[in-house]
Curated annotation (Swiss-Prot):
Composition skew (Low complexity), residue ranges: 682-693
Bilayer-crossing regions: 10-30, 75-95, 164-184, 226-246, 259-279, 316-336, 363-383, 398-418, 636-656
Family: Belongs to the lipase maturation factor family.
Region of interest called Disordered, as start-end residue ranges on this chain: 660-702
Record keyword Nucleotide-binding present: no
Location of this chain's protein in the cell: Endoplasmic reticulum membrane
Function: Involved in the maturation of specific proteins in the endoplasmic reticulum. May be required for maturation and transport of active lipoprotein lipase (LPL) through the secretory pathway.
The protein, known as: Lipase maturation factor 2
Domain of life according to the entry: Eukaryota
Membrane topology note: Multi-pass membrane protein
Pfam families: LMF1, LMF1_C
Length: 702
């Protein structure tokens, strides 16, 4: 089996990069979301209940309990955590020595601490996915850093036998994510997914589209439907190939997943989610595929024994059979036909919901057994490598580490089976009770989660959008435009990846229902009426662009509109819209309606203030850092960090010694010398044999 040391390093660097984006993006929004004058102050979530420290940390796992000991309030503690997380992630991205389990443990603890107080603004599937992936990175990271100079035939020398084992969990996580995301689209009974028309709405109605989404939206309908078919193929049929014994099948699965994620990044602003999914796909690669050495990538055709030749032929036959079955199944179940007159491909769903439910009931448990068999094989390979370890002390040390990591891997696999089985209730009930108990004991730590993206297509008939309006007299109203979400019909959609403006995202969810389903919206209205600058900066990072920057509005209200992308011929607008209804009534400070809502949602409650000193040096340092960074728009800050990483890596590459090339040349010279010696020896031997035959033949005649 091919080694995966290079993919593991790519995975660890990718996780560090995603942590970097996640921490930095969250840092820019803390004052407006969680500060004392924010929409949902974080201090409301941490109220001491007289419990011991360790019990408190276990039940509510966040380091922010310790913020008062440092003289910080909860929001400042969150500032400190996100800054430290950003610096640690930057270090892990740039330095091999910092890709250590302890560093990834600190990153996971920091993000888990922020998640605990993040409330609705951090309740996204990608936040849970980052926590689960981040925990796996703790296990994948080697205890000793890889050396750049100890590379032997593409595999790092001195590799321990168990180092590939935890990396298998990354592949299992990718399988759960993709398979569940495909299945839930059909189990939801959403008519757009079943009718293959989902993408005719998706580009227009997704939370934060990019400019490319406008162009994608105007593609032909038949191409949209064919794209939905391809999505089902990639998300449902391809994931089992992650565990295929034939590496070319796994590589095909990798490129299919990568293509899907890149297309989503181009057409939608999904922050770090698709980047994180791409990081997970590294588990499908191996050193041979990624190595730059010709000796690993290109092999001379050497004569092989007939069993190997037969095995190669059978593998090729099996590979072609799999591709044929995928093609046949796609054509059959989605009724693909070519209309030669119109030059289009027709498609339709040819199976029923009942048939799909029966199929799902049939295959879900076998996929569990597929994962079990794959893990069992990995364990056998690891045990075989351990047996081959030389030296009793090294074997004993490797055995201890193998026992710990093997137990952790099996335990995490069992834990993950419970959320995975949610896709099919029958399978959920048939799981081993021990797995349920194990999952229940650690569920609050977010070690394993259920996934299912784009379950239903919203916005059919136009995307709903909430538009805030302010007034001084209650008669003349001015729209309050957000930086990122659709508002001004003439403004093009932005490109924000990897930043996630969490208020803009929640505004999209709020528009899908009544305002009472989004209690935080009342908190937003209150802070804007009070003129709180941290919240205003969430709406407009440059306060001068906020229409009420000189004096807060006396009245606020919200209207619900429906938005559509403009037609291709309309050059002056990206959107057109239509008023639907009032979303939030006109209120002012002290208004009985507003006071009732604040009381109903608990937004008037005040927790005890955290003890802190006004002359605290740490607090002053945190305030100074924020003052320096606040003028930068969040996307610019994140892309600036990324640019700095790229620049440093380029400099590192240029200044690094290049022992590989010289060693490669040395090996090449030795090989040539050896081949010359062998050929010279062979010629001498042939001459000697010839002479001996010549001298022996006449004697035989006599």
């Amino acid at each position: 089996m091919a080694s995966s040391r290079v993919p593991q390093q790519l995975f660890l660097q990718g996780v560090a990069a995603v942590y970097l984006f996640a921490f930095a993006s969250l840092y820019t929004q803390i004052p407006g979301l969680y500060g004392p004058e924010g929409i949902l102050p974080a201090r409301r979530t941490l109220r001491p209940q007289g419990k011991g420290l360790w019990q408190q940390l276990w039940e509510t796992p966040t380091l922010l309990w310790e913020a008062p000991r440092l003289g910080l309030d909860t929001a400042q503690g969150l500032d400190l955590l996100t800054l430290l997380g950003t610096v640690l992630a930057l270090g892990a991205l740039l330095l091999n020595s910092l890709r250590h389990p302890f560093v990834y443990l600190l990153l996971w603890v920091a993000y888990r601490s922020a998640y605990q107080v993040g409330q609705v603004f951090l309740y996204f599937q990608w936040d849970s996915l980052l926590l689960e992936t981040g925990f796996l990175a703790i296990l994948v990271a080697p205890l000793r850093g890889p050396s750049k100079h100890k590379i032997l035939q593409g595999r790092l020398a001195g590799a321990l036998p168990h180092e590939d084992l935890p990396f298998w969990l990354v592949r299992w996580l990718l399988f759960r994510l993709m398979f569940a995301s495909g299945v839930v689209k059909l189990t939801s009974r959403c008519p757009t997914w079943w009718g293959l028309t989902a993408l005719t709405y998706h580009y227009e109605t997704q939370c934060l589209p990019t400019p490319a989404a406008w162009f994608a939206h105007h593609l032909p309908v038949w191409l949209h439907k064919l794209s939905v078919v391809a999505t089902f193929l990639i998300e449902i049929a391809v994931p089992p190939l992650f565990f295929a014994p034939i590496r070319r099948l796994r590589l095909t699965a990798f490129y299919a997943q990568a293509l899907l994620q890149v297309l989503i990044i181009i057409t939608g602003n999904y922050n770090f989610f698709n980047l994180l999914t791409l990081v997970l796909t590294t588990a499908l690669l191996d050193d041979r595929h990624l190595s730059a050495e010709p000796g690993l990538r290109c092999h001379k055709k050497m004569p092989t024994s007939w069993p190997k030749a037969l095995l190669t032929a059978l593998s090729l036959l099996l590979e072609l059979t799999v591709y044929g079955l995928l093609a046949y199944g796609t054509v059959y179940y989605f009724g693909l036909e070519v209309d030669w007159q119109q030059h289009i491909i027709l498609s339709k769903t040819t199976f029923t919901f009942h048939q799909f439910s029966q199929w799902l009931k049939t295959v879900t448990l076998p996929t569990v057994w597929l994962g079990t068999a794959s893990l069992a094989w990995e364990l056998l390979v690891v045990l075989w490598r351990w047996i081959q370890v030389q030296g009793w002390s090294r074997k004993f040390s490797a055995g201890i580490q193998l026992s710990v990591l093997g137990t952790a891997t099996v335990a995490l696999f069992l834990i993950s089976l419970v959320p995975y089985s949610y896709v099919e209730p029958g399978t959920h009930g048939r799981l081993w009770t021990g797995a349920h108990r194990l999952f229940g004991s650690v569920e609050h730590l977010q070690l394993a989660n259920s996934y299912g993206l784009f379950r239903r297509m919203t916005g059919v008939g136009g995307r709903p959008e909430v538009v805030l309006e302010g007034s001084y007299d209650g008669q003349h109203w001015t729209e309050i435009e957000f930086m990122y979400k659709p508002g001004n019909v003439s403004r093009p959609p932005p490109f924000l990846t990897p930043h996630q403006p969490r208020l803009d995202w929640q505004m999209w969810f709020a528009a899908l229902g009544p305002h009472t389903h989004s209690p935080w919206f009342t908190g937003l209205v209150l802070r804007l009426l009070q003129g709180k600058e941290p919240v205003i900066r969430l709406v407009q990072s440059h306060v001068a662009n906020y229409p009420f920057h000189e004096r807060p509005p006396t009245y606020l209200r919200a209207q619900r509109y429906k938005y559509w992308f403009s037609k291709p011929g309309d050059q002056s607008r990206w959107w057109h819209r239509q008023w639907v209804e009032e979303f939030f009534p006109s209120v002012s400070l002290g208004d009985p309606t507003l006071e009732t809502l604040l009381q109903q949602f608990g937004l008037k409650d005040k927790s005890p203030p955290r003890a802190r000193s006004p002359s605290n040096g740490l607090a002053q340092t945190l305030n100074w850092v924020r003052t320096q960074l606040s003028p930068l728009e969040p996307p610019i800050l994140l892309w600036g960090l990324f640019g700095a990483v790229v620049a440093i890596r380029v400099v590192q590459t240029l200044l690094a010694p290049r022992p590989l090339q010289s060693s490669k040349q040395t090996r090449e010279e030795k090989r040539k010398q050896t081949s010359k010696k062998d050929s010279r020896a062979a010629s001498e031997q042939a001459a000697a044999n010839s002479n001996s035959r010549d001298s022996w033949a006449p004697r035989r005649k006599k």
